[in-house]
Amino acid sequence: MNHDFSVVTIVKGRIRQLSNLIASLEQSTIVPSQLIVVWMGPPCSESLLTSEKFHIVHKFVCGETLPIARARNRGFSASESDTVVYIDVDCLVAPTLFQSLLSVAGPGKVVTTNVAFLPTVPEKVDYSRLVKMASLPVAEIVEKEEAFIAFHTRLFAIQKADFDALEGFDEQFTGYGVGDADFAARCKAAGYILHTVDDGVLHQFHPRFEPPVNHLFDIVNNAAPYKARWGAYPFSHYLEQFAKDGWINDDYSQSGPRIRRIPTEKEMKSYLVSKLD
């Protein structure tokens, strides 16, 4: 059964993950009226994907290496529904998740859920089987009101009017991470309330760096405008690690972070997480 809400996701290269996400949406007890896929790149054969359960709209954003904020804003602007659910392309939704999200969603609310992590990208989507493979069980505790400090944008539902009132994601924050922190801070400043439902999502595995040294330039370049707005640097734990390893200046907290050197190939490999612990 279709309900009047839209889903937005953005993608760059993760075709198999996107196919799995679509499969999980199709298996939901209620499905969106539309899925908006924003491709961070030019059209390709996969950007013709369709579904028998809901309408898939394909949009395109090019010109930057990783135009995350622009892509998300493009997706939200294309939504025809009052309620919009943003989902990271790596996520698989629990069959009853949308029911729970919509039962809570409304003006002034941001609704999210808990995340459990899969060790692989599955060949077939069967949520009841896959949830048993996840690193941690999906939490069953429902927090009615929470601070936005730990909010992650992997999945959230918001009213389109509330998103528009914030003017979406700030496109001055390019690339990874800092734009998410800014969006959460602006939601909190606007008086929105964060709710968490317990149905959960599963995150399909992909290699990553911890700390995210592959996004060193994004974090450093976005640090100053974030501090100018909020009075503190974002991702201070990452900046501390970057300084410890000599990639940025030691006195970054006083004079602002600056790139001192680029990580070596050996250093990059040492921080690569290639499997789920």
Please name every model-derived segment.
Residues G63-S79:
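Glycine-rich, basic loop-to-helix element that forms the pyrophosphate-binding segment
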Residues L155-I158, D162-E167, F173-D198:
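A short, conserved alpha-helix in the catalytic core of glycosyltransferases
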Residues V84:
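Short aromatic/hydrophobic "clamp" motif used to bind/position activated sugar donors
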Residues V197-V213, P225-Y226:
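Active-site donor/metal-binding and catalytic loop motifs
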Residues T96-Y127:
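Conserved donor NDP-sugar-binding/catalytic core segment of glycosyltransferases
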Residues A23-P32:
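Short, acidic, metal-binding catalytic loop of nucleotide-sugar glycosyltransferases
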